[in-house]
């Protein structure tokens, strides 16, 4: 439950004096990124900000308390404030935050900025009491927010200390207005107006100056002095004498003597009871105190001026002034310490009645009542889990004693799921093992249903640890133990059964189970699991050779992401990755590249280790285009990641394919040999990733001349592919078999394998796999076409392949990489002008791209540099080669290519 009062600015400012000297400094605040009100407690930061912004229509206010250090909670309140300031300009970002469907705070802010691009009104967002935030993740996110937020937004922060928001940098760049305690402190003129407004006898200049100097302009102290004068019917001069020894350290004593002791016992007790609550309405107070007249009491205190502020726009919601709240807490602990635990328990129960278990947990913790904590977690834990309150839940569970945790299987399960949902896969198994041991020691007997829930999660752990047989056994056992009401565990167990069958090569059963998983997940609105099931279905269909069907399932997955705002979850990258793989196979390289880059964007703030798949695809695309310089940079990234982390064979096999293709083009046999010697060799090849790994091994063996070993490898994987009906891998294997036959000098066998591959390609649409070795198989494709040995569809496909091979070869010559340029400049017939005015490597690349028909903008994008830089390169190469225009540049490039035999 979100507390509405946290999103409302303070009301009732009619007693505050107008402060033109401060307001004048804020006249041009819209020209600054940040307005910071920074001072110790009691200097009127919030009041000053509220007064300044009172007539600003586009305003969002967020009152922070110490429970807001949870990034999920903080972001939800902040986005609600932003939407209030911008008239709901960021609805999608709000939905992402509420559903916790963002990969990082940066990516969520990026969505905010994208949505705010269409909002042009001047607006303000206030973060009140930011000093209560100590979470570094939030600080870092807010620094990013300040750096990139739109110019029409001004952030206003009130804080007792300097917030770690990069204020030094903002100050140097003149992008911040800072209102410190020296400005917030009253001067003599303001002190005079302040007391004249509150004290019937007024104040003379000498007394005002004396008062101002004594309390150093501290508004709260002045308020206390005015209260003393009012209640004791003293003049201000007499009041000054009574507080001659007043200072910050003695504030509590002063408040006791001059304010608190003036109240009747009933009011004092009521205030101490209410002070347990940070925010409250009459219903909460009534539940806490048992009083039926709670609202009347609160309104009476408000009229009396006892630091209770009604919250603007919310009926009967209040909060104490921070300073007074601290004082009341001090009094409560000094005067009624024996009631502290009971009050905190009562506050917890009051918040539960208000459907706010998050607040209830905090008070149960303050009550040191772990039994109450356990009860709240047992009753509300899964609901909070589904709402994304993961950190709050984990902190509460960690406060429980072992008996409290392990006597309740539901809490053990919740603890393990918290680790699983936060991708701490290595912790989950340990937590489950410890839970089993502790429950046995406590003689806790699990019901059949509870056993099923534990086994479902154990099955997920087993599949994460690449133990498919164990995972299948546990998942099937779980399904036999679970009833239909435990939908989450049934969905997980069903998914694991499908995933295991996929890994073991039982594709038809795997597909059926994943379709069932999707249906259940959609029915119970577990959309992450539905998305996972769709991704698995796509991979299964692809393995079965139904590539178009796999593509269409991916379309459904993209639709689900749109509908449920799942754009920033890591599974979105998985979808983009497998979409890129299909597009690469169809030789739609531009689209594949876009998908891979978008995948990197989704994972922007995740561990770099997760980027391996995308870099593997980008390297493969660059190699296919002949952009070996670019490919080399991706290869370096891949090699770095492989050294830093341990990966599943699915990841390493894809990365290895890119490495081998790069080394093959670079004729680097040393690297290929080293890879082959250390390569993983799966026991079976019953799924797409073990097939790919063995196919990589065969490719390396062919490249190194180990042809008999390659034959043995290919025989093995083809036998496995046919046994498990891996149609797409059969298609790919045939192409490598043709490559082996060519290397052995057996063109007849190579043609036979190519014909089979072309026939299967009618179903799969595979083109990219042929183009990998286009230079070696091209002449045989021509022979097959000319001999008339192909059917109409196969012949059409062969013509397309020959055209693409020709284009690819041309592309590789057009992209002037280092190797090509070195051969060119050393050619005996190179024009003297080229020899005497050598181009830089980048200028050669630009010339090649001009020849390819790229515009300046496209060249800049291709080389990842600014457009102005490209113009400089073009000007330089024109001067060096005595070229007048683009047409002459194309002619010059063509002449050089012809010189090299292209």
UniProtKB/Swiss-Prot annotation:
Any matching Pfam family: TPR_MalT
Activity regulation description: Activated by ATP and maltotriose, which are both required for DNA binding.
DNA-binding region per UniProt: 856-875
Keyword field: Activator, ATP-binding, Carbohydrate metabolism, DNA-binding, Nucleotide-binding, Transcription, Transcription regulation
Coiled coil spans: none
Binding sites annotated in the UniProt record for ATP: 39-46
Domain HTH luxR-type residues, every copy: 832-897
Disulfide bridges in this chain: none
SUPFAM superfamilies: C-terminal effector domain of the bipartite response regulators (SSF46894), P-loop containing nucleoside triphosphate hydrolases (SSF52540), TPR-like (SSF48452)
GO molecular function ontology, one term from the record: DNA-binding transcription factor activity
GO process terms (BP): positive regulation of carbohydrate metabolic process; positive regulation of DNA-templated transcription
InterPro entries tied to this protein: P-loop_NTPase, Sig_transdc_resp-reg_C-effctor, TPR-like_helical_dom_sf, TPR_MalT, Tscrpt_reg_HTH_MalT, Tscrpt_reg_LuxR_C, WH-like_DNA-bd_sf
Taxonomic superkingdom: Bacteria
Subunit: Monomer in solution. Oligomerizes to an active state in the presence of the positive effectors ATP and maltotriose.
Family: Belongs to the MalT family.
Role: Positively regulates the transcription of the maltose regulon whose gene products are responsible for uptake and catabolism of malto-oligosaccharides. Specifically binds to the promoter region of its target genes, recognizing a short DNA motif called the MalT box.
Descriptive protein name: HTH-type transcriptional regulator MalT
Biological source species: Vibrio cholerae serotype O1 (strain ATCC 39315 / El Tor Inaba N16961)
């Amino acid at each position: 439950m979100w507390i509405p009062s946290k999103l409302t600015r303070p009301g009732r400012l009619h007693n505050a004096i107008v402060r033109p000297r401060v307001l004048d400094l804020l006249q041009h605040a819209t020209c600054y990124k940040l307005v910071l009100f920074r001072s110790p407690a009691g200097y009127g930061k919030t009041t000053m900000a509220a007064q300044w912004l009172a007539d600003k229509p586009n305003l969002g206010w967020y009152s922070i308390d110490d429970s807001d250090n949870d990034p999920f909670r903080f972001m939800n309140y902040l986005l609600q404030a932003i939407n209030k300031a911008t008239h709901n300009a960021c609805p999608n970002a709000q939905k992402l935050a509420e559903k916790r469907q963002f990969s990082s705070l940066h990516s969520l802010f990026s969505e905010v900025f994208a949505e705010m691009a269409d909002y042009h009104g001047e607006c303000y967002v206030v973060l009140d009491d930011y000093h209560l935030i100590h979470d570094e993740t939030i600080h870092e996110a807010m620094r990013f927010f300040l750096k990139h937020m739109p110019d029409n937004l001004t952030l206003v922060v009130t804080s007792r200390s300097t917030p770690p928001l990069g204020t030094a940098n903002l100050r140097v760049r003149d992008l911040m207005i800072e209102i410190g305690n020296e400005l917030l402190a009253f001067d003599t003129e303001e002190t005079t107006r302040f007391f004249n407004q509150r004290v019937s006898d007024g104040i003379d200049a000498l007394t005002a100056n004396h008062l101002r100097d004594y309390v150093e302009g501290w508004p709260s102290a002045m308020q206390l002095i005015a209260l003393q004068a009012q209640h004791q019917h003293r003049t201000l001069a007499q009041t000054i004498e009574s507080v001659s020894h007043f200072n910050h350290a003695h504030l509590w004593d002063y408040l006791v003597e001059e304010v608190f002791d003036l109240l009747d016992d009933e009011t004092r007790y009521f205030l101490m009871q209410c002070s347990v609550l940070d925010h409250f309405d009459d219903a909460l107070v009534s539940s806490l105190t048992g009083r039926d007249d709670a609202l009347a009491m609160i309104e009476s205190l408000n009229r009396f001026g006892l630091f209770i502020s009604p919250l603007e726009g919310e009926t009967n919601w209040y909060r104490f002034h921070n300073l007074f709240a601290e004082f009341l807490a001090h009094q409560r602990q000094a005067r009624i310490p024996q009631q502290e635990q009971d009050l905190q328990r009562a506050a917890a129960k009051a918040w539960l009645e208000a459907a706010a278990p998050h607040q209830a947990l905090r008070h149960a913790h303050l009550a040191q009542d772990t039994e109450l904590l356990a009860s709240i977690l047992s009753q509300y834990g899964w609901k909070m889990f589904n709402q994304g309150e993961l950190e709050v839940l984990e902190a509460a569970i960690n406060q429980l004693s072992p008996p409290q945790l392990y006597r309740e299987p539901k809490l053990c399960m919740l603890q393990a799921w918290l680790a699983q949902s936060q991708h701490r896969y290595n912790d989950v198994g340990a937590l489950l093992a410890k839970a089993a041991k502790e429950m046995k020691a406590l003689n806790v007997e699990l019901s059949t249903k509870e056993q099923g829930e534990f086994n479902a999660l154990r099955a997920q752990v087993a599949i994460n640890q690449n133990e498919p047989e164990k995972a299948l056994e546990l998942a099937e056992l779980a399904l036999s133990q679970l009833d239909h009401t435990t939908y989450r565990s049934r969905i997980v167990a069903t998914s694991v059964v499908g995933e295991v069958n996929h890994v073991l090569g039982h594709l038809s059963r795997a597909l059926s189970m994943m379709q069932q998983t999707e249906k259940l997940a959609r029915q119970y609105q577990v959309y992450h699991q539905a998305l996972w099931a769709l991704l698995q279905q796509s991979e299964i269909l692809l393995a079965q050779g139904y590539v178009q069907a796999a593509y269409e399932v991916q379309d459904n997955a993209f639709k689900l992401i749109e509908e449920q705002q799942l754009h920033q979850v890591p599974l979105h990258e998985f979808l983009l990755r497998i979409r890129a793989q299909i597009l690469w196979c169809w030789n739609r390289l531009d689209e594949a590249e876009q998908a891979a880059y978008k995948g990197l964007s989704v994972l922007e703030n995740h561990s770099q280790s997760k980027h391996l798949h995308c870099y593997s695809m980008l390297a493969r695309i660059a190699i296919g285009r002949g952009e070996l310089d670019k490919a080399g940079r991706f290869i370096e990234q891949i090699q770095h990641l492989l050294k830093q982390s341990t990966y599943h064979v699915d990841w390493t096999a894809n990365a290895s394919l890119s490495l081998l293709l790069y080394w093959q083009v670079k004729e680097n046999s040393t690297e290929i040999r080293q890879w082959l010697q250390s390569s993983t060799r799966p026991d079976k090849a019953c799924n797409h990733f073990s097939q790919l790994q063995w196919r990589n091994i065969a490719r390396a063996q062919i490249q190194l001349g180990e042809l008999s070993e390659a034959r043995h490898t290919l025989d093995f994987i083809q036998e496995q592919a046919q046994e498990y009906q891996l149609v797409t891998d059969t298609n790919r294997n045939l192409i490598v078999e043709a490559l082996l036959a060519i290397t052995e000098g057996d063109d007849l066998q190579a043609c036979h394998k190519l014909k089979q591959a072309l026939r299967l390609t009618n179903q799969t649409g595979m083109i990219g796999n042929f183009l990998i070795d286009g230079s070696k198989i091209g002449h045989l494709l021509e022979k097959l076409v000319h001999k008339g040995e192909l059917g109409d569809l196969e012949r059409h496909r062969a013509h397309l392949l020959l055209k693409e091979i020709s284009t690819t070869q041309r592309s590789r010559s057009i992209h002037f990489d280092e190797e090509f340029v070195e051969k060119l400049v050393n050619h005996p017939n190179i024009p003297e002008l080229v020899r005497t005015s050598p181009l830089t490597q980048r200028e050669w690349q630009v010339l090649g791209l001009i020849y390819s028909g790229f515009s300046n903008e496209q060249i800049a994008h291709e080389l990842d540099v600014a457009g102005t830089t490209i113009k400089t390169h073009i000007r330089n190469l024109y001067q060096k080669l005595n070229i007048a225009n683009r047409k002459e540049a194309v002619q010059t490039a063509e002449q050089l290519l012809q010189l090299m035999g292209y």
